[in-house]
């Protein structure tokens, strides 16, 4: 109820001061609040908000060993890459949470470039890191970017994806991770600067420099091109971690040529290119090799941490199919389980899936496609069959696209009764 004093003047419902004693009274449904009480409430809320903000900032960052242990649960192999990424990410977020303003030492940002063949796990590693740290994550394709003023996407659209991933919470987005894929595709065509305009190569590298280093960027809220009569979202990229990935096809030859040039003279040990595989050569990469490949010096300078990934062999691909928490085989078993069917994929079948992926040169990325091809028929039929208890995938199902073996239970609806009759059949004999 509205409160009045003895002179029937309006009073604050909280502190009791009259209209004459305060600067302003704000009316609510049956109550009034004065400007002094509003200010006091504002201070209380701000103090509580600051406390929660400080708690969030100093929240414990996982140690490099802890980050790697979590990565091991999801990513098979690539131990050297996981160690490098764990240290780099730990140092990055330690830098954000540290009170650098109180010291004379400025901790600079260290972005990451990942080199590795297709399907070696570059994108998945970046996604898993963001999941571990619980920060917003966005993926961009470098091939769709062009220099400002040309047909294609502006580099600021990358930041819009991160803002959207953070539900438009700018403060949260400013501590996120952006993965730029196919970064090798924006290399300039030759090591020497071009006299012609390269809007999708060197031009994009130049456009990315500022946001990689750290700047206050203006992002169009609806994406697309900027124009002078629209509002922009302001975002500071200083604390955003950029991870750039690419296959860098052919860079192994650049490294080999550099190493080969040192092997001159009578006493020199000469190594042929066959002595080292691509993965081993990538371990010897230097910034000058990236320059030779076509990245400009300023761009390479903003990606000081170089992480290399190895090609996945047959053993690693089989492990990827079965061991991680979200392994493909476990995913398919879960799908079949939803139809009350057990799925068994035999070891010989798993090995043949890995061999096919190596033949296709698709790495881990191609494993799902191979499984889908082989199991499309049975996944189409089983939901309509009420008496299937188990599905067994052998090598011939993968190699020859033959039908899997099904174990039927003719009395499926009364399985709890003793002696339920079970039969083994090939899928062709099931109507």
UniProtKB/Swiss-Prot annotation:
Keyword Zinc in record: yes
PANTHER family documented for this protein: ATP-DEPENDENT CLP PROTEASE ATP-BINDING SUBUNIT CLPX-LIKE, MITOCHONDRIAL (PTHR48102:SF7), ATP-DEPENDENT CLP PROTEASE ATP-BINDING SUBUNIT CLPX-LIKE, MITOCHONDRIAL-RELATED (PTHR48102)
UniProtKB keywords: ATP-binding, Chaperone, Metal-binding, Nucleotide-binding, Zinc
Signal peptide: none
GO cellular component: HslUV protease complex
Biological process per Gene Ontology, one example term: cell division
Disulphide bonds in the chain: none
Keyword Transport: no
Domain ClpX-type ZB: 1-53
Listed PROSITE patterns: CLPX_ZB (PS51902)
Binding site for Zn(2+): 12, 15, 34, 37
Cited Pfam families: AAA_2 (PF07724), ClpB_D2-small (PF10431), zf-C4_ClpX (PF06689)
Protein name: ATP-dependent Clp protease ATP-binding subunit ClpX
InterPro entries assigned: AAA+_ATPase, ATP-dep_Clp_protease_ClpX, ATPase_AAA_core, Clp_ATPase_C, Clp_protease_ATP-bd_su_ClpX, ClpX_bact, P-loop_NTPase, Znf_CppX_C4
Subunit structure: Component of the ClpX-ClpP complex. Forms a hexameric ring that, in the presence of ATP, binds to fourteen ClpP subunits assembled into a disk-like structure with a central cavity, resembling the structure of eukaryotic proteasomes.
């Amino acid at each position: 109820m509205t409160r009045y004093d003895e002179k029937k003047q309006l009073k604050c419902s909280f502190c009791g001061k009259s209209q004459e004693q305060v600067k302003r009274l704000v009316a609510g449904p049956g109550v009034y609040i004065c400007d002094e009480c509003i200010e006091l409430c504002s201070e209380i809320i701000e103090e509580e908000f600051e406390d929660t903000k400080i708690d969030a900032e100093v929240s414990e960052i996982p140690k490099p060993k802890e980050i790697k242990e979590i990565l091991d649960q999801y990513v098979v192999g690539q131990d050297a890459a996981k160690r490098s990424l764990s240290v780099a990410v730990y140092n990055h977020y330690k830098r954000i949470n540290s009170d650098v303003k109180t010291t004379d030492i400025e901790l600079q940002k260290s972005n990451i470039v990942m080199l590795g063949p297709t399907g070696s796990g570059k994108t998945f590693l970046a996604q898993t890191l963001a999941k571990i740290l619980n920060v917003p994550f966005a993926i961009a394709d470098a091939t769709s970017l062009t220099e400002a003023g040309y047909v294609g996407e502006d580099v600021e659209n990358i930041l819009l994806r991160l803002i959207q991933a953070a539900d438009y919470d700018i403060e949260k987005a400013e501590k996120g991770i952006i993965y730029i894929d196919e970064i090798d595709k924006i290399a300039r065509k030759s090591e020497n600067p071009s006299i012609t305009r390269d809007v999708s190569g060197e031009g994009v590298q130049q456009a990315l420099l500022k946001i990689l280093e750290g700047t206050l960027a203006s992002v169009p809220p609806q994406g697309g091109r900027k124009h002078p009569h629209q509002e922009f979202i302001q975002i500071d990229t200083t604390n955003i971690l950029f991870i750039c990935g690419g296959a860098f096809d052919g860079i192994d030859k650049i490294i080999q040529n550099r190493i080969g040039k040192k092997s001159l003279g009578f006493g020199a040990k000469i190594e042929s290119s066959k002595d080292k595989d691509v993965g081993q050569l990538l371990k010897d990469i230097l910034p000058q090799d990236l320059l030779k490949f076509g990245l400009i010096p300023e761009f390479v300078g903003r990606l000081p941490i170089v992480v290399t990934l190895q090609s996945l062999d047959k053993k690693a691909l089989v492990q990827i199919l079965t061991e991680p928490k979200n392994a493909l085989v476990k995913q398919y078993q879960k799908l079949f389980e939803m139809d009350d069917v057990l799925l068994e994929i035999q070891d010989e079948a798993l090995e043949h899936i890995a061999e096919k992926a190596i033949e296709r040169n698709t790495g881990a990325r191609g494993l799902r496609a191979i499984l889908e091809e082989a199991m499309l028929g049975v996944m189409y039929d089983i939901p309509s069959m009420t008496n299937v208890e188990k599905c067994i995938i052998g090598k011939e199902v993968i190699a020859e696209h033959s039908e899997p073996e099904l174990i039927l239970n003719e009395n499926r609806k009364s399985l709890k009764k003793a002696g339920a009759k079970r039969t083994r059949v090939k899928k062709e004999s099931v109507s």
